[in-house]
Amino acid sequence: MYPFVSNHPTTHTSYSTMPGFSGLDDKSCSSRYTDSVMNSYPPMGVPGSASIAQFYQQAAAVSAASAGVGVDSLGSACSQLSSSVGGAQSGLPDITRHPWLVTASQSALQKFASTDWMSNPFDRVVCGDFAGPNGCPRRRGRQTYTRFQTLELEKEFHFNHYLTRRRRIEIAHALCLTERQIKIWFQNRRMKLKKELRAVKEINEQARREREEQDKMKNESLKSAQQHHSQKQAQQEHTVVGSQQTSNGGGTGGGTGGSGGAGSGGSSGNLGSHLHHPSIVSQNDLKLGLGGMGVGVGGNLSMMGAQT
């Protein structure tokens, strides 16, 4: 623990010129009291309980004397305190005072006194030297380009997406801009082009997927139509075959009936005179029918020969 060093000068008031204060002397009382109090601290490691008790007793006596009404009692208490402390000072060892400690403490106190420690440290450190609305740093405004500058930069970007240092200096001088502004504009323009190409690629990809889906749906509809047409054609063929089969069966039955009718026509005249067993009758009818057919054929041939 280091001794307390006061940087404030002690104010000495001359009480000799005022009536009633003849017993007080600034040099004999105040200066000796200050020196004795500063030297009354015990060294480190040495408890010094007797000196501490004596110091507190003397401080209590001074406070009681200052609270009293009489000024002479204050002067006597001050003189008694100085004499007692002066006697006790001879028994205490001297405290070593290093000059760099005193200098460091004084510089620290001066720095603390000169600093406005009640203000906000954030405002003092971060926002102290800027002219923002609330003391905070103002954001830098966005660079605006004229129509002519934008047109020239777009023409240059159309031919070259990247500029050399020499070409950048030429454009900067021609358009009254800085190299940094030209560089930043080209960087932003390249990013814009990249985004545009990405958007076009996404649009083309989406259109391709939609076209593939439409082609797939069209192929499926064609396949279903072909299957339906093939099924319908098979049904039509089946109905045609069935109708042909039915027509063939009807013609065969009609031919058999016609031959039977011819035989019965030829033998109709003999049915009344020949009454026999049914089987015999049918055989006779067949014979007669065949005979009638032969007669008819022969008659036709004879008629053709007569005509010729």
UniProtKB/Swiss-Prot annotation:
Biased composition regions of type Low complexity, renumbered to the chain: 223-247
Q: Which segments does the entry list as coiled coil? A: none
Q: Spans of biased composition, class Basic and acidic residues?
A: 207-221
Q: Where in the cell is it found?
A: Nucleus
Specify the DNA-binding region ranges.
138-197
* Region Disordered, residue ranges: 207-277
The GO molecular function terms of this record are: DNA-binding transcription factor activity; DNA-binding transcription factor activity, RNA polymerase II-specific; RNA polymerase II cis-regulatory region sequence-specific DNA binding
UniProt record, GO biological process: anterior/posterior pattern specification; negative regulation of transcription by RNA polymerase II; regulation of DNA-templated transcription
Checking InterPro entries in the record gives:
Abdominal-A, Antp_homeobox, HD, HD_metazoa, Homeobox_CS, Homeodomain-like_sf
Family indicated by similarity: Belongs to the Antp homeobox family.
Role, per record: Sequence-specific transcription factor which is part of a developmental regulatory system that provides cells with specific positional identities on the anterior-posterior axis.
Protein name, UniProt field: Homeobox protein abdominal-A homolog
